[in-house]
């Protein structure tokens, strides 16, 4: 991109929010963008990404199926994956994404008296935002508040992984109302934080 190559195609799998940010960035840089979504993503979320110039591809199945299809087609077509989920040999972009999430914690700290924070409640998903916020708490706060990580009972990949001490895959049989939280496996990068900080 920095050399003026506008033929780059970026791709990601999403339930909505991450895909919107990738579509926005691609449009800003003049790149083509392919967004893979599961059949459970609402038409409104898909349209929001289309409105940003992305080509949205609906995949039969859940989020994990859309991620598998994204990786497959990206490999076949030489597209650049911009994913917030880490796996073996794909860690850099998810680390940058998590670093961006820590800005939210810094903004919170800058706006309130940090001694007044007693509890922080975080969504789990694949663990990226939760792991980043926990790292931000450790970095920016003197007094560590009680931190609660929540996830749907039908997609409790963080809780099940914490129980066994290793990443567990959840076969999601029932989608959550919060589609973006319906994730079956913890991302490798945040797992290194979550396994040592969540009970």
Across the structure, where does each feature detected by a protein language model lie?
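A short, small-residue-rich loop immediately preceding and capping a beta-strand
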Residues: 1-37, 116-129
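Rossmann-fold NAD(P)-dependent oxidoreductase module
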Residues: 21, 25, 48, 111, ...
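A glycine- and small-aliphatic-rich helix-loop capping segment at beta-alpha/alpha-beta transitions
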Residues: 24-34, 135-144, 166-168
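Short, acidic/small-residue loops that bind anionic groups at enzyme active sites
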Residues: 31-48, 140-154
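Small/polar-residue-rich loop-to-helix segments that shape phosphate-bearing ligand pockets
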Residues: 34-119, 162, 166-199
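Glycine-rich beta-alpha junction loops
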Residues: 86-89, 124-128, 151-156, 177, ...
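Conserved PLP-enzyme active-site core in the AAT-like
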Residues: 107, 128-132, 137
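Short acidic/glycine-rich loop or secondary-structure boundary segments that cap or lie
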Residues: 129-131, 155-159, 180, 190
